[in-house]
Amino acid sequence: MRYKMGRVLTACSVVMVLLVSWNMGSVRASSLPHRVFILHSYEAGHVCGQPQHDGVVAALRKAGFKEEENLEIEAYFMDTKRKNNTPELIDEQARLALGKIRDFRPSVLVTLDDNAFRTVALQLVDSDIPVVFSGMNGQPEDYNQKTPWLESRPHPGHNITGVYEKLHIADALKIHSRLLPGVKKVWVFVDPSPTGRAISKQIKLEMEQESVPCSWEMKIATTWEEYQKEIRSANADPEAGAIYPAALLLKDGEGHSYTAPDILAWTVQNSKKPEIALNYAFTRMGLFGGAAVDFHAMGSQAGQMAALVLKGGAPGAIPIEDAQRYALVFNLNRSKELGIQIPADILMAADDIVSAKP
């Protein structure tokens, strides 16, 4: 009898140990940190990428996902503007990024800007890695023609969702025309890179959808020298009331690359027209300003989507959104250089006023 009782107690002990072990494993699994991989198209600290990154992290924190508590973040910078800007180098960066992503095994991948989405996210369609994009300039439907990943913007339907970078250029021209009522024409400058072509299409689409109080002319600068020549031509055009510099990658005759900091610094030194800023942060680089894309807010939108995925939501059921917010920002030092007096009511409505030189 004692022998049988001992066997029963031993069996019960084994069951208890197994139950406790299973329960501890469940607790351990639930407390494991969520893993978010943020893939940048550009270099660390880039004027477009870094604000989006910060917005993603801030939104995750607000949703309860905090580093060193329940969140692990890894980032990789493809550096496809300044350094790795040929098709071969971009493809090599995509290969390296995919390897790092698969090793990290993220709960969600966040891609910032088009090159990361185009070369990496589209290779992960219908994989077990959820993807949230931010800063997409290309049309989602155009990417879908290359690799099917999208049923519709309201219901993407696969494992990808995100934020389309609406430029709000029509709003920018309306505000500038109110600021300077005599504006007849705005010169828009773009470059022929993949992102530049996408921005060109965005501008045309947005202008078709809304009426603006002035005319506009698009110039595609294929080289650094051509860009310089076109800026000087705009200076000489009496009808040009402003320029919209959206050429962010140019090469000179010797193959040297010029990116946003180089291009905008030269523009501020040589342009005689107020510059409408595409990016909120461009005013801190010396541009006049106006209504500009708020990249931090756009990243925050993407971060909110990533938080939904971490909480169990399916990316395919989360609607793709336009970047909702533009910021009204002005550089007072630049306005003084140009001899422009910004009305008090517009300054009071501004989200930010920059007074320091870049």
What are these regions (language model features)?
Residues 2-12, 22-358:
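Short hydrophobic alpha-helices and adjacent helix-cap/hinge residues
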